[in-house]
C-alpha cells in the first residue's frame, strides 16, 4: 500500500495524545483552522481561510440560544462540508454544542424526506431548495406529526416568498412549532 507511511491508526493516535495538555498549543488569533471554497457567486471561486476564532464565535452564538439547542439533540447536515456554511454550521457548531451530527455527504434530493423521517433531526441547515423538496416529499406529506423538528434553517441562497409560505404552511400542518428560519 503506497499510503502506508501516511496512515496513523486510531489506537496510536489516541495513545500519542494521552498525556498532552491543551496548553501545549499556544493561542494564535490569526490561526486558520480550515480553508473552505466559495462558489464564485460574486466573482471567481476561491479558497478562504477561516480562523479558530471565527468558527468558535459562531458556535458560541448558537450556545447563547440555549432555549433552542440542547445537548443530545440531533442535527442533520445536508450541506457539503467543504463549504463554510456546511462545515461551520453543520459540523463544528453542533459538535461543540454536544449535538449528534448526521452527515449526508452526497444528498439525493429524492431521498431527503426518507432521511428526515429515518433520523428525525431536531435541527437541519440547508439551502432553500432542500426545504422545498422536504415539503414536496410524498412520504412526509403522509405523516401527520413532524413535531420533532425544532430549527430548520435556510441559507446560501434567497428563498422566494411563495416558496417560504409553502414550506411554512407544510411545517405548521405537520405540528412543527417554529417556521423555517
Regions found by a protein language model. Give the residues of each.
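Conserved pre-ATP/AMP-binding loop-to-beta segment of ANL
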Residues: 2-8, 14-37, 44, 67-74
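Conserved structural elements of the adenylate-forming
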Residues: 13-16, 20, 29, 48-69, ...
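Short beta->alpha linker loops
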Residues: 54, 107-108, 129, 158
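Conserved AMP-binding/adenylation subdomain of ANL enzymes
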Residues: 56-74, 82-123, 133, 137-138
Amino acid at each position: 500500500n503506497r499510503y502506508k507511511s501516511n496512515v496513523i491508526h486510531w489506537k496510536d493516535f489516541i495513545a500519542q495524545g494521552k498525556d498532552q495538555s491543551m496548553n501545549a498549543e499556544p493561542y494564535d488569533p490569526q490561526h486558520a483552522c480550515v480553508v473552505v471554497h466559495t462558489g464564485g457567486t460574486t466573482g471567481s471561486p476561491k479558497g478562504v481561510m477561516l480562523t479558530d476564532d471565527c468558527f468558535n464565535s459562531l458556535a458560541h452564538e448558537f450556545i447563547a440560544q440555549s432555549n433552542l439547542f440542547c445537548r443530545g439533540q440531533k442535527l442533520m447536515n445536508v450541506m457539503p462540508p467543504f463549504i463554510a456554511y456546511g462545515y461551520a454550521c453543520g459540523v463544528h457548531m453542533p459538535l461543540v454544542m454536544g449535538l449528534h451530527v448526521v452527515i449526508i455527504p452526497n444528498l439525493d434530493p429524492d431521498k431527503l424526506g426518507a432521511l428526515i423521517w429515518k433520523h428525525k433531526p431536531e435541527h437541519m441547515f440547508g439551502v432553500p431548495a432542500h426545504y422545498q423538496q422536504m415539503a414536496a416529499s410524498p412520504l412526509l406529506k403522509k405523516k401527520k406529526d413532524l413535531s420533532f423538528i425544532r430549527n430548520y434553517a435556510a441559507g446560501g441562497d434567497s428563498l422566494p416568498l411563495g416558496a417560504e409560505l409553502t414550506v411554512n404552511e407544510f411545517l405548521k400542518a405537520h405540528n412543527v412549532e417554529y417556521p423555517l428560519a
